[in-house]
Amino acid sequence: MFVTILRSTTLLQLKPKLGYNKYLTRLRTVSLAGAVTLAASAYYCYECFWNTSMEFIHHPEAIEKHVLSIFADIKYRPTFYIPHRLMQLAYATRWEKKLDTEFERQLFKLSDGGQLALDWKNKHVVTNKPLILITHGLTGGSETNYIKHAAETLAEAGYQVVCFNQRGVSNCELLTSRYHFHGCTNDLREVINYLQENKQKGQQIFGLGFSIGGSLLLKYAGEEGYKCMVNRIFSVANPYDLLDCSHNIMKLRNKIYDWSITCNFKMLLKQHQSSLAENEKTKGIQIQEALKAKNTYEFDELITRRLFDFDSPEQLYSNIGCGNYIKDVKVPVFIMHSKDDPIVPQFLVPYDQIKQNPNIIVALTNKGAHVEWFTGLKPQRWIMNPILRYFEEIQSL
């Protein structure tokens, strides 16, 4: 805006040197640019500092509609110098300080001979609070900052916390040639059954899922129905239809996210290359070609869909999401979305299905990107504010 004002001043000085018509044309152009800049600045300030309340979507007779009052004073204001979703991603990737969180690791043996890592906080604490099971997104497990921040915040509040890492994730050795598949709930079910048998007497299990990890929890809850052993779920940036999400992420404006996810896929593949090698003969996977993949679709064509016997990536994606299980969820679920989420944009959230299930409530913020939600002059992750408030207050209502 200041540049526009300076240009206007310069135009006044140039008036004698320009013809009258050229001068008016130039003045109109600069004035229009100034007006657009002023309007954009006003909209930016409105979105960041005034339009900060959460919006809620739910069934008219939602079972937990009474809990919405606990969020009345919780507002999200993004860090003013990184309000855009790309800026938040860049900050999380390049500049956010890595948390030095210490977990107690348990190597959990699966029924097929495989293993995965359960990372605990407060494992041996005696508490009357629920056990919180955290499930991660596509780009990493308990080594990621958003999982560490969640675990630390909940542990400081006195909760037992266990982070579920998919097979091969978070530096956990593969004991079989089977890889993780975010659409299969079998491993998660085995872990939940174990937690149910070994938790403290009378203790409930709450689920906290991020991105595809939230979808996995909801799919499990839908499959189990009334038998679900997770008593309550909070899902963050939950994808519902991975086929639609795949089409969205391949768009030019979202290529940076697709590239980031692909890099993580290739890093994990390289780490477990020797364990997966036998699948080149038995399943037809192409490891060396996949390590050169330019996007997630290429990677899934060469590796994932072949490992799990799907005919195409499209068929694979159609079997991952929780969208078809929303109607069968029988436990209370609270889902948090940002309206500027590039991975799960608003038009991919199945509001009509959600409104038909009285067990589900969706909360929306205007900003926040995918799982970032940075706030404050020195950016801090905001998302644990509503999560902790929900878990704390729901026990006293």
Residue ranges and their predicted role:
Residues 329, 335-337, 341:
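Short beta-strand/loop motif that positions the catalytic acidic residue
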